[in-house]
């Protein structure tokens, strides 16, 4: 067939859409195509796509693998050391896409705590997602750990130990209201990256650009390793409450 690669990202950024890896692999392999899975948001701690039929797995090691926001790196994993692996490593060497020794050391340092950081941030993200579903200023919460998420059953099958550190939610009142919430957060820092020890927030629509389908009222959270009660308190003081929620007003607190 004409299709050579089927590319999936699961969970997807920033919508948290979940792709059934096993079903995708069955269809792709029947057509003679390979499956490449971007598993950045899961890390190998929560999901190992090769075990579900993927041929290659990609990670932005800049994100949670490193976890300290001080490295630019990536990883490509093959199912076995075969002809495909040889082609990938040959191309990597000739194009010079080789990580520097200091960056490699930083990445190894960060990965020593991976199995501590990922479960903590995932558990905190789950609590935050559940809390946001009850808030009057939030119209929708996107997180595969919620039973209401359309991909929850698939995520349960192919993920273990949690559903990841990233979630998104939509704010009542539109894009301006979402911007006010992001600006009002104190512990969550406004930044584009994700997967570090610090919790981040981003108004995502301007980053994604027009035509991508990302709504203007969507905020993306990357949950770090802070005390989750502090993160919940930060969200509570930034989100409008009561009648203010429908008007997109601010939630003012005493200084």
Description of each model-found segment:
Residues 1-137, 142:
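Conserved PLP-enzyme active-site core in the AAT-like
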Residues 11, 40, 61, 170, ...:
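Anionic group-transfer/hydrolysis microenvironments
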Residues 82, 175-177, 229-231:
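Residue-level signal for secondary-structure boundary sites
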Residues 103-126, 131, 162-163, 170-173, ...:
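N-proximal accessory regions
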Residues 117, 183, 199-255:
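PLP-dependent enzyme catalytic core of the Aspartate aminotransferase-like
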Residues 137-219, 223:
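Conserved C-terminal alpha-helix-loop-beta "cap" of PLP-dependent enzymes
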């Amino acid at each position: 067939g004409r299709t050579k690669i089927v590319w999936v990202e699961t969970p997807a950024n920033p919508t948290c859409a979940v792709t059934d890896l096993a079903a995708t692999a069955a269809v792709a392999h029947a057509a003679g195509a390979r499956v490449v899975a971007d598993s950045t948001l899961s890390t190998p701690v929560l999901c190992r796509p090769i075990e579900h039929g993927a041929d290659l797995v990609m990670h932005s090691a800049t994100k949670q693998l490193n976890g300290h926001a001080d490295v630019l790196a990536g990883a490509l994993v093959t199912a076995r050391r075969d002809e495909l692996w040889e082609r990938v490593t040959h191309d990597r060497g000739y194009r010079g896409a080789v990580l520097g020794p200091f960056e490699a050391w930083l990445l190894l340092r960060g990965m020593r705590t991976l199995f501590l950081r990922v479960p903590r941030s995932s558990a905190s993200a789950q609590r935050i997602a559940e809390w946001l579903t009850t808030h009057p200023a939030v119209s929708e919460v996107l997180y595969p750990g919620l039973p209401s998420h359309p991909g929850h059953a698939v995520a349960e099958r192919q993920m273990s130990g949690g559903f990841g550190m990233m979630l998104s939610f939509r704010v009542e009142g539109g894009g301006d209201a979402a911007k006010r919430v992001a600006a009002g957060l104190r512990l969550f820092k406004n930044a584009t990256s994700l997967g570090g020890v610090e919790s981040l927030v981003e108004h995502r629509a301007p980053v994604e650009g027009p035509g991508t389908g990302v709504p203007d009222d969507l905020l993306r959270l990357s949950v770090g390793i802070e005390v989750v009660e502090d993160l919940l308190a930060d969200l509570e003081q930034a989100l409008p409450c009561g009648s203010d929620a429908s008007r997109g007003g601010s939630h003012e607190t005493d200084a």
